[in-house]
């Protein structure tokens, strides 16, 4: 019964990426890759930690936040770039549906939170 408490902060996280955690490793193993036109909704684990710290340090009443990096390339664009960066391989996708963009702006407005780890900075992710 969390909603009965006077203070709570619920973080709804996008797909998590970080050191030793990148979905491109699993996608490379698949023969068929679906929904290349769908956007990615990802968040770096360092930004998740900062979001948690902002919730703990700035007490607000009853808040629920989506935590998702504000850039949303397509799956085909994003994972193909990652595959080239890490493995010097090209990936192909079936186009499929576009999907939903998850917006994580509310936490930026209400808690002075900043997304500081770009999902396209591949250097430390594998």
Residue ranges and their predicted role:
Residues 119-126:
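Amphipathic terminal alpha-helices
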Residues 49-104:
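Mid/C-terminal beta-alpha module of Rossmann-like enzyme folds, strongest
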Residues 9, 41, 100:
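Residues that recognize and position ribonucleotide moieties
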Residues 24-32, 37-65:
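Alpha-helical substrate-binding/gating segment
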Residues 1-19:
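Conserved beta-loop-beta element that borders a ligand/cofactor-binding pocket
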Residues 19-26, 77:
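Short beta-loop-alpha junction of Rossmann-like oxidoreductase domains
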Residues 45, 75, 112-116:
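Amphipathic alpha-helical segment in the mid-to-C-terminal domain
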């Amino acid at each position: 019964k969390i909603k009965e408490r006077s203070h709570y902060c619920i973080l709804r996280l996008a797909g998590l990426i970080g050191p030793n955690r990148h979905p491109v490793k699993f996608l490379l193993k698949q023969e068929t890759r679906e929904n290349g036109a769908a956007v990615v909704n990802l968040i770096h684990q360092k930004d998740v930690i900062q979001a948690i710290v902002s919730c703990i340090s700035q007490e607000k009443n009853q808040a629920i936040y989506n935590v998702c990096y504000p850039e949303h390339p397509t799956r085909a664009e994003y994972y193909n770039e990652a595959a080239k960066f890490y493995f010097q391989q090209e990936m192909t996708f079936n186009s499929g549906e576009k999907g939903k963009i998850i917006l994580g702006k509310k936490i930026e407005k209400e808690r002075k939170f900043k997304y500081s780890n770009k999902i396209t900075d591949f250097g430390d992710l594998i």
